[in-house]
Amino acid sequence: MRDIKDYSLKAHNTFGIEAKCARFLEYSSVEEAQEVARILRETGSPYLIIGGGSNLLLTRDFEGIVVHSAILGMWIEDDRMTCGSGEVWDEVVEASLMAGLYGAENLSMIPGDVGASAVQNIGAYGVEVKDLIREIHAVEIATGQERVIDARDCQYAYRQSRFKNEWKDRFLITSVTYQFSKTFVPHLDYGNLRENLVLGSGPKMKNFSLGPDPSAKFLREAVMRIRGEKLPDPKVEGNAGSFFMNPIVEREKYEALAATYPTMPHYEVDEGHVKIPAGWMIDQCGWKGKSLGHAGVHDKQALVLVNLGGASGQEIVVLCRAIQKNVKEKFGIDIYPEVNII
C-alpha cells in the first residue's frame, strides 16, 4: 500500500491541474483496501475516492485523504470477465475482443479506470456499461467487510448510479464483473457512427461484414478514429472528455424548440422524453473554439472544455458557468457538468 503525505494530484487528473492532498492512500489488493478503510474510520479525515482522474476537476488543494485503487488483473470465465478496479477501461475493451467477447466496442477509448466505470455508468454511441456490469466487488468502509453488489441494485441511469448518490463514499471498489456476448451484434444507430464506419481505406458500410471477427475490431477502430478526431489528447491539452451531460427533456419542450430549430439533433429516450446534445446547444451559443482566460472550449467538440495551459480549476468553473448561463438563456434548458468538481 502506498501512503504518502502532501501529495501532488497533477498526474491523477486529466485536466492537468496542479493541486495537492494532505495524504494519498493507494491500495493494490482487497486486504489493502480493508486497511485503507480502517485508516479512514480511525482518522475521521475527509476523504476523496478517485479513479483515473478523467472525470475530475480540482479547484483547490484537498485537505484530507485521497484514495486510489491500483488493483490489476483480468479473469475470464465463459462470457464473464472480472477486472481489478485499477485496470484501465480501454484495455478491458481490447482484452474482451481478443477473448472473443463482444458488447463494449462502442465504449472504446473512454478514459478512466474500471472502478469508475461502475460509478459513472460510462456510455458512448448508444451503449452504456450498465448493460454489461453484473456485479461489483467492494469493501464497505464503515465495516471493512467485503461486499458483492448486484448491478440490479445500483439503480443505474444516464451517467448515474447509487455510488454517486446515497452510496457515495461508502465503498472502496476492488473489482467489477462484466458479462459480454459471444456473438457480435453491432450497435450503429447513434450519432454519426454508421456513416463514419470505414473499414480501413476500403468501402463504406454497404460492405460491412457482420461476422464475429474481424468486424468487431473494425468497429472498435472506427470508434477510436472518430473519438481521436473529435477529442483532444489530454497529454497535449488537458481535458476531461465530455464536460456536460446531455439533457433529457420532456417531449413538449423538445417539440417547442424543434419548431424554432428544425435541424436540432435529438435522440428518443422514451415516449415522453427526448435527449438533446448539449454540445450542439453550446455550439449554437457560439462557444466552440472560444476561451476565457486559460480555459477554453475545444474547436472540434463544444462539449469538451480544455486547459489551454496553466489554467486553474476555478478558471474552468468560470467558463462552465458562463456556458450554462448562455444555454439557459437561449434554449431554456439547464445543462449540468458530468465532471466531478472538487
Q: Predicted regions span which residues?
A:
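Phosphate/pyrophosphate- and phosphate-bearing ligand-binding catalytic cores of soluble enzymes
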Residues: 4-5, 10-17, 146-314, 330-342
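Anion-binding (especially nucleotide phosphate/pyrophosphate-binding) glycine-rich loop
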Residues: 1-143, 153
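A common structural junction motif
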Residues: 42-46, 324-331
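Residue-level signal for inorganic ion chemistry
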Residues: 29, 53, 112, 144, ...
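Beta-rich strand-turn-strand
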Residues: 101, 313-316
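Generic structural marker for isolated residues within well-ordered, non-membrane alpha-helices
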Residues: 93, 278, 324
